[in-house]
Amino acid sequence: MSEPPFDDDQHRISRRMVIAAAAALAVPIAGYGDAVSQDATKVARMPDTKSTWPHGARLAVSFSLMFEAGGQPISGAGGVIPDPIQQGLPDLPTNAFFEYGVYEGIPRILDLFDKHKIKMSSFMIGHAVDKAPDLAREIVKRGHEAAAHGRTWENSYALDPEAERRFIADGMASIEKVTGQKPVGWNAYWMRNSPRTLDILQSLGFLYHIDEPSRDEPFIVPLKGGEFVTIPYTFHLNDIVSFPFVGWDAAAYEQALRDEFDQLYEEGSHRRRMMVVSLHDRISGHANRVRSLDRFLTYARSKPDVWFARKDEIARWALSTRSATPIINRGPPTVTGLPGSAA
């Protein structure tokens, strides 16, 4: 997808960068016995110019739609029932809960975002795409990004290097075969990657990942193969955390979205700010939650200078505005405990 048109002279607005080089970190990393040194994580180049989002926007808002139904294990996936089923037995109601995402949730969410003319990034599990190819194609047909979420809905961080690469590449191949779009974005199961994942992703052609909740703006991490973008995640705006575990109702979630938006929008007058929200097919696709999202989107769209963007657009924008994008040099994840290059 092409980058949004912009004219630096016409659309650049004032901003004050507040990212400062971190003080020395001397926190022991559990399991390694080493301290994070002053040089383990640092800002490689401080932005020295004013910057904006496209067209002078003061806030970028990006939604993720998690397409997971059919990619979960038949037993032990977890859901709304607090008592886990006996190991090895099919969890019938939980699997039916996942099916809701295909038959009701995603179609309802797609219609809502069509109404508001907003495009999302859909993180798709390979097996989910294989089982519901028409739905995957429909997501892309409506202008949303097809991003990768693994071959199945399970951890991959403990796999050996070749197995991890296959796990990522297999899911990627399913998405490209069905939708015609090669994924450039990655989200791991519960954000847990191995120390080498980012290097693997880059070698496969990915531009960005979202598996780090450390900032409210995108940044670049240099890897051995070049620059790689991080588009930070937000746990507290993830519906899978808010609804089943915290026990929020739709009204409380809507208020949290508004509060997050208002604070970041205010900060956006002098800092580049970004708000990201993750929606799951089987959770936010329920009728009352879509109604709540509808009200929030109406509110957010009423504000001027807001850029609603897919995450691939944000990643490309970050790479095209290097003078204004933090570049974070990190040591190996086994030393820093943070995502980076294993080399």
Region annotations inferred by a language model:
Residues M1-I13, A21-V27:
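N-terminal secretory signal peptides
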Residues G31-Q38:
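Signal peptide processing junction and immediate N-terminal pro/mature segment
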Residues A40-H55, A173-R271, R322-I327, A342:
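Active-site-adjacent pocket scaffolds in enzyme catalytic domains
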Residues K42-F97:
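N-terminal regions that are enriched for targeting/export leaders
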Residues A44-M46, Y208, I220, R258-A343:
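C-terminal domain-boundary segment and adjacent tail
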Residues V61-F63, A146, W307:
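Residue-level marker for buried hydrophobic side chains located in beta-strands
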Residues M66, F113, L201, I231, ...:
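Conserved, mostly hydrophobic/aromatic
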Residues Q86-P90, P107-L110, D114-P195, P218, ...:
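Metal-dependent polysaccharide deacetylase catalytic core of the NodB/CE4 family, i.e.
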